[in-house]
Amino acid sequence: MALYRPLLLHHPTSPSVTTFLRNYPSKPIKFSSLPFLHRCRKSRVSSSSARCCSSMESPPEGYRRNVGVCLMNSSKKIFTASRLDIPSAWQMPQGGIDEGEDPRVAVMRELKEETGVHSAEILAEAPHWITYDFPPDVREKLKVRWGSDWKGQAQKWFLLKFTGKDEEINLLGDGTEKPEFGEWSWTSPDQVVENAVEFKKPVYKEVMSAFASHLQ
């Protein structure tokens, strides 16, 4: 059970201890079982922001097709996690859609790959694709990683209800991909936006608006 007072750590080789997270200002956090070495890596992100996100009926040319996962628990808190490469940046799970893959299949696959979670059901789907541009430095970095020069991402967002227990969450994922996250927490919609990297804030505001009736 996630605690919102002292910070509860979970580590496979040591007993639970109580502490506070430096990268998550004034917010308690629940750690996964990710080894300690993964929680110490640091990097910086540019403060430059992309243009504001926009909503479209279909993905535009030049944008990578992607699904976003807004995972909500029984207390209507939303799952967010800190990136290993940018520990100060917290985000909801997301990932690319494979060629010919249904977005509803992709969203469940990405959730399991990144968090180990399989106990979830789709409650709602955002009516439009939400697009955003990469800042120039991020675009260059991703061009090397992906081998394609995408302008940004076109995302289809889904609201999922978490039906399992917190112990199911494992940031090592299902073992099919390299871990992306270091810590995780259940947070309010406002905190989701507040703690996101700058160029994703407009996207997250639109996602919270799209699912507002379910999050109240």
Swiss-Prot record:
PROSITE patterns: NUDIX, NUDIX_BOX. Its cofactor is Mg(2+); Mn(2+). Keywords: Chloroplast, Hydrolase, Magnesium, Manganese, Metal-binding, Plastid, Transit peptide. Expressed in roots, leaves, stems and inflorescences. Coiled coil: none annotated. The keyword Membrane does not apply. GO terms for biological process: nucleoside phosphate metabolic process. It holds the Pfam family NUDIX. Its main location: plastid. Mn(2+) binds at E110, E114. Residues 1-53 form a transit peptide. One of its GO terms (cellular component) is chloroplast. Its EC number is 3.6.1.-. Disruption phenotype: No visible phenotype under normal growth conditions. Residues 62-209 form the Nudix hydrolase domain. Belongs to the Nudix hydrolase family. HAMAP family: Nudix_RppH. This is Nudix hydrolase 26, chloroplastic. It comes from Arabidopsis thaliana. The gene is NUDT26.
